[in-house]
Design a protein with these regions (language model features):
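Helix-turn-helix
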Residues: 5, 16, 20-63
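Amphipathic alpha-helical segments used for helix-helix packing
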Residues: 89-90, 104-125
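Hydrophobic alpha-helical connector segments
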Residues: 76-108, 160-167
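C-terminal peripheral helix-coil segments that are non-catalytic and often amphipathic
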Residues: 1-5, 95-99, 135-151, 161, ...
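Short, solvent-exposed amphipathic helices
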Residues: 78, 125-136, 140-143
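Short, basic, alpha-helical segments at the C-terminal edge of helix-turn-helix-like DNA-binding modules
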Residues: 66-71
Length: 199
């Protein structure tokens, strides 16, 4: 007689596991986070992690990057993502970035930027997520600069696309500097000098 074996119901919520894994990767990075760390952070056994996320640690990491892009990035961008964003929203984004970098929690930086530094060069899928984030940020900044130019808030000769690339690079540099030297005067000077080029 054939006995149908029903799969055991999951004893955890994958979304909750993903959130905890994202926080652990964000705090420690990919290489420094072991399966044991993930088990401790999520409370889920290794076999269950591999069952829910085929590919194990790396699959969970890639899902964590996507989760970060979906949940955390919109909070960081805030009004900068609005089609009407202009110079005030650009400055507000940088002010928020500096505030974050000066806080104990903010010292861990951005999961996507950390990934770019740590292992994007050797992981095409991770690099694709990082590139998507940078392109999103660049589009937001280009729109804001375009609006700022039409409103006379920056020089008429400013190229929105080129200016956006400069500001995106400044953001990434700020995050790296902020991790090593969280000095408010230094961080604000970096941001102010980038905007001075556009004034």
């Amino acid at each position: 007689m054939y006995v149908l074996r029903m799969p055991r119901p999951r004893e955890f919520e994958p979304e909750a596991v993903l959130n905890q894994a994202m926080l652990r990767f964000w705090e420690r990075g990919y290489r420094a986070t072991s399966i044991e760390d993930l088990v401790k952070a999520t409370g889920v056994k290794p076999g269950s992690i591999y069952s829910a996320f085929p590919g194990g640690k790396r699959a969970l990491f890639l899902k964590s990057l996507e989760r970060y892009s979906k949940l955390v990035v919109p909070q960081k961008l805030g009004e900068l993502e609005a089609p009407s964003a202009s110079l005030a929203e650009l400055r507000g984004y940088f002010d928020g970035l500096v505030r974050d970098l000066l806080s104990p929690e903010g010292r861990q930086g951005c999961l996507l930027v950390n990934t770019a530094i740590e292992n994007a060069a050797g992981d095409d899928e991770a690099a694709a997520v990082v590139r998507g984030h940078l392109a999103r940020l660049e589009r937001c900044m280009a729109t804001a600069l375009r609006n700022a130019r039409s409103q006379g808030e920056v020089r008429a000769s400013v190229d929105p696309e080129g200016g956006a690339k400069l500001l995106v690079a400044t953001c990434q540099g700020l995050m790296v500097v902020g991790k090593a030297n969280p000095d408010e005067a230094v961080l604000r000077a970096i941001a102010d000098n980038a905007f001075a080029v556009l004034a």
